């Protein structure tokens, strides 16, 4: 019986090693492991007959059985390693990039030229210690006109057509209304810059739009003078346009006195770029400030005009057309 069982064990080893070597998938290899070395496998079935052997025969058969088990396990490990390596290599081959193929196009967004001007301007003023203030686009007549020294019968109202709403409110014609609301809530000293969209009943053409953007600044403190205003504007324009000549021309605005227009020498000619002036005492009084104690200055400019000058844009309507051929230039 011993020689018969020994022969069966050796035959099982030979058969198992051949089957394992022929396995071409990890799933098939696992099936063979269970078939030969599992609890109900072929090797276990042969070893269960050892109970009928004598005590002298069992050690010999046990040693042979261990050798067979170790040999089959070694074959399984070797084949598994080989199959796993082949599987990884196949995956790498399938994922190998063809460097001659064009990549996947991922378009990048760009900053709109108007947003770019607003960001640059705010960076300058924030660097000078100004706070960014926001306000309502739908305003009352009081905040848009009356508090800014422009009563209902004032001739300055003819300077700009206004969009009036059925409820008596209006679409703001400038961001100066932000300054009034801010001053009502805060005590001097004040240094704010107010960007925003404004509305006027202009005929749309190459240089005019019914909706555009303004940025206005306001400073209120004791002892502020026109010299402080000129210095602030000079620093700002140098940051935006470089060290170019500027000049101040006497002008009129109902909410500043004295008032001035600011011109910039650009490509050999003077361009009007800003309006400015010292805050009118009547504006101070409308928000409860004492003009005998405080003085202030204000200035403003159109964002679209700055964008058109800096980027050499010939038609303001291009800024609103959402034409990617145009916007991709910035």
From Swiss-Prot:
State the UniProt keywords alphabetically.
Aminoacyl-tRNA synthetase, ATP-binding, Cytoplasm, Ligase, Magnesium, Metal-binding, Nucleotide-binding, Protein biosynthesis
| PROSITE patterns reported in the protein's UniProt record | AA_TRNA_LIGASE_II
Gene3D superfamilies to which the protein is assigned, alphabetical: Bira Bifunctional Protein, Domain 2
Question: One MF term in GO for this entry?
Answer: phenylalanine-tRNA ligase activity
According to the record, cofactor stoichiometry and binding are noted as: Binds 2 magnesium ions per tetramer.
Cofactor (UniProt)? Mg(2+)
For this protein, what reaction is catalysed? Answer: tRNA(Phe) + L-phenylalanine + ATP = L-phenylalanyl-tRNA(Phe) + AMP + diphosphate + H(+)
Show the CDD domains listed in the entry. Answer: PheRS_alpha_core
Q: Which Pfam families match?
A: Phe_tRNA-synt_N, tRNA-synt_2d
Which terms in the GO cellular component ontology are assigned? cytoplasm
Taxonomically, which superkingdom? Bacteria
| Amino acids binding Mg(2+) | 257
EC identifiers of the protein: 6.1.1.20
Where does the record place a coiled coil?
none
Q: Name one GO biological process term.
A: phenylalanyl-tRNA aminoacylation
Q: HAMAP family this protein is in?
A: Phe_tRNA_synth_alpha1 (MF_00281)
Q: Which family does it belong to?
A: Belongs to the class-II aminoacyl-tRNA synthetase family. Phe-tRNA synthetase alpha subunit type 1 subfamily.
Q: How does it assemble?
A: Tetramer of two alpha and two beta subunits.
Q: Which PANTHER family match?
A: PHENYLALANINE--TRNA LIGASE, MITOCHONDRIAL, PHENYLALANYL-TRNA SYNTHETASE
* Name of the protein in question: Phenylalanine--tRNA ligase alpha subunit
């Amino acid at each position: 019986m011993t020689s018969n069982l020994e022969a069966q064990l050796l035959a099982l080893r030979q058969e198992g090693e051949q089957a394992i070597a022929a396995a071409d998938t990890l799933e098939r290899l696992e099936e063979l492991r269970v078939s030969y070395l599992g609890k109900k496998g072929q090797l276990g079935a042969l070893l269960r007959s050892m109970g009928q052997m004598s005590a002298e025969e069992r050690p010999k058969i046990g040693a042979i059985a261990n050798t067979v088990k170790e040999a089959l396990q070694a074959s399984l490990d070797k084949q598994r390693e080989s199959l796993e390596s082949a599987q990884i290599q196949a995956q790498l081959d399938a994922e190998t990039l063809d460097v001659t193929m064009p990549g996947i196009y991922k378009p990048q967004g760009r900053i709109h030229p108007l947003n770019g001007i607003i960001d640059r301007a705010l960076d300058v003023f924030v660097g000078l210690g100004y706070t960014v203030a926001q306000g309502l686009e739908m305003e009352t007549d009081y905040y848009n006109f009356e508090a800014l020294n422009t009563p209902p019968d004032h001739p300055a109202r003819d300077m700009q057509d206004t969009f009036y709403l059925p409820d008596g409110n209006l679409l703001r014609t400038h961001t100066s209304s932000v300054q009034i609301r801010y001053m009502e809530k805060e005590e001097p000293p004040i240094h704010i810059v107010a960007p925003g969209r404004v509305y006027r009943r202009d005929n749309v053409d190459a240089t005019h739009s019914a909706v555009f953007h303004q940025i206005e600044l306001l400073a209120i403190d004791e002892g502020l003078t026109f010299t402080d205003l000129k210095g602030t504007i000079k620093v700002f324009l140098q940051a935006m346009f470089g060290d170019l000549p500027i000049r101040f021309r006497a002008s009129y605005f109902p909410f500043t006195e004295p008032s001035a227009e600011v011109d910039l020498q650009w490509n050999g000619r003077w361009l009007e770029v800003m309006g400015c002036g010292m805050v009118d005492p009547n504006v101070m009084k409308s928000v409860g400030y004492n003009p005998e104690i405080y003085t202030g200055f204000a200035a403003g400019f159109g964002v679209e005009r700055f964008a058109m000058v800096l980027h050499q844009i010939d038609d303001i309507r291009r800024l609103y057309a959402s034409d990617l051929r145009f916007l991709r230039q910035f």
